[in-house]
């Protein structure tokens, strides 16, 4: 009998990363989900109402007035407060809030499904783009240096890397010097149907996202 635990940044929105987490949870339905914090009643929380969710000791502080973004500097403390040493296998669904650096046992195997290294740490544009404000940029210069050290250190603790695209595979190698395997997020293709007529191609791209 293998003891399995799942880890995710936080339980709030139900986006693409959370859909992957749902599939992982369906594969291991008895595995508890450890997370930095959980917003009860949120769309994501409702999707995982049938699962055991374990919040970190810092959850109340992170949720208070929705301060988890400016309090990212607490991430090393948040994740180190979670002890997963009793598990044989830990699968972490990691992105902007790291979801790494937790305590593990000597024989614990850790697999990361990486949606992307934290975008705000490496100069990529984010959905909020708070660094357009000079105060945030000054704050980021100081804090992000230490978070990059934590990000690299916690990445070194992963046994196997899985990524969701070739682009993220390049980022994982660039920032962590780690090889990874691309496994695209699952799509229920049987629900799709072919177009009833030929689609005329025009000079634009259509992007659908939340």
Regions found by a protein language model. Give the residues of each.
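Short amphipathic alpha-helix
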Residues: 17-27
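Conserved donor-binding/catalytic core segment of Leloir-type glycosyltransferases
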Residues: 199-210
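Short hydrophobic "strand-cap" motifs at the C-terminus of beta-strands
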Residues: 7-9, 164, 207-209
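Active-site proximal beta-strand in glycosyltransferases
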Residues: 89-92, 103-133, 162, 181
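Nucleotide-activated donor-dependent transferases that construct or modify glycoconjugates
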Residues: 2-14, 36-37
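Membrane-proximal helix-turn-helix segments that form the acceptor-binding/catalytic region
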Residues: 130-161, 169
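Carbohydrate-associated surface elements
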Residues: 167, 186
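Active-site donor-binding segments of glycosyltransferases and PAPS-dependent sulfotransferases
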Residues: 30-99
């Amino acid at each position: 009998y293998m003891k399995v635990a799942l880890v995710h940044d936080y339980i709030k929105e139900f986006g693409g990363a959370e859909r992957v987490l749902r599939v992982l949870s369906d594969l291991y339905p008895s595995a508890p989900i450890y997370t930095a914090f959980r917003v009860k009643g949120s769309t994501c929380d409702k999707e995982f109402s049938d699962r055991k969710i374990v919040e970190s000791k810092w959850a109340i502080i992170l949720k208070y007035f929705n301060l988890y973004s400016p309090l990212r500097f607490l991430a090393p403390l948040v994740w180190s407060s979670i002890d997963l040493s009793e598990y044989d296998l830990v699968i972490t669904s990691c992105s902007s809030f790291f979801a790494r650096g937790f305590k593990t046992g000597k024989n614990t195997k850790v697999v990361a499904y990486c949606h992307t290294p934290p975008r705000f740490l490496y100069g990529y544009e984010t959905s909020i783009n708070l660094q357009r404000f000079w105060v945030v940029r000054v704050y980021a210069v100081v804090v992000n240096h230490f978070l990059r050290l934590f990000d690299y250190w916690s990445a070194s603790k992963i046994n196997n890397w899985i990524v969701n695209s070739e682009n993220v595979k390049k980022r994982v190698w660039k920032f962590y010097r780690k090889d990874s395997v691309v496994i695209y997020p699952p799509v229920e293709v049987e629900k799709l149907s072919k177009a009833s007529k030929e689609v005329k191609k025009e000079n634009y791209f259509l992007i659908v996202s939340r």
